[in-house]
């Protein structure tokens, strides 16, 4: 019985879509397969160009011919994707920029530009920011000045700006870009810089009626205002704000705060710091309808300090919590869980840098009625605070189905010794305690 060559039975249109998932250098290699495949790569509706592969100056002419040949084959039909990684060692930046303009004019849908250069390229060009076909735009290490024209990107859904340098009107540039994207759904901003001072932009306003996902990566203090009624996913990573204003968060499903301190501007919360207390209170209240939360240990440290001075709102919709508890923030655990009365899943990253004298007395409502799955990471064998923590869940969780304990160092002999230290009787008879 002859083997069937399923690949060669596929039409060219489907094969080129498959090759689109490969880097261009890999799709070119398929040309040696057979006569049919010789020029098939030229019809792939995407180009992934990695300029570091052409560091030899003598390769420049060949590279330009390669690009021209590819564009001649593809510009008659619309390209779907163009990705370029440019390194300073090459001497043909202008040719690359001309190529980018050409692919935009050809109706590109997905444009990704990564410029690894010391002198950033000015990337404000009318044909790019008035494209009627761009669906996603990702830029790295380029310069964006305030455009003297109206930005219009009617199809753009994904905008990712990484280490972008702006002029003195930096915040206005971002606002213009966002306002010119009427169907924008996914926005990511990573360390935006002022081109004159090299300082991170200190003020940012994000206003969009269509935005669903927002990720902010800031390294220094600043202010941010967010007005996005359809926002479902929000992430702050290494971001610190001395002022944060969010509104219209009724659609928010998930929030992730992975930062040293998102509210920091001069140390931990103090009683004489009413402005900071108000910022935290307003922020927590607005996000209190969230269902899924990931939060860092540094933020919990701040919340522990805040809980002594103010109130933590009820997160009544929260069913999944992933949090890092270490140091004094571990004392916040019962209080924080009390604010999550319907919590079902809890993932804890536990860190005991020193022996903490923890003594839990309160039993939150979620332990009695809803908490079914607890996963504790980074436990240490024979470390007393961790043992108390595990015993706390065992003896107080009425509906717990699975308690998973993950140790930094683990052996089967040690696990048996650890089990003997768990002296509490399981309140939930069906609970499984799993060591990994």
UniProtKB/Swiss-Prot annotation:
SUPFAM superfamilies assigned: F-box domain, RNI-like
Domain spans labelled FBD: 355-407
LRR repeat extents: 287-310, 397-420
Keyword check for Metal-binding: no
Gene3D superfamilies assigned to the protein according to its UniProt record, in alphabetical order: Ribonuclease Inhibitor
Name of the molecule in the record: Putative F-box/FBD/LRR-repeat protein At5g44960
Keywords, in A-Z order: Leucine-rich repeat, Repeat
PROSITE patterns to which the protein is assigned, alphabetical: FBOX
Keyword ATP-binding: no
Domain F-box, residue spans: 4-50
Pfam families: F-box, FBD, LRR_At5g56370
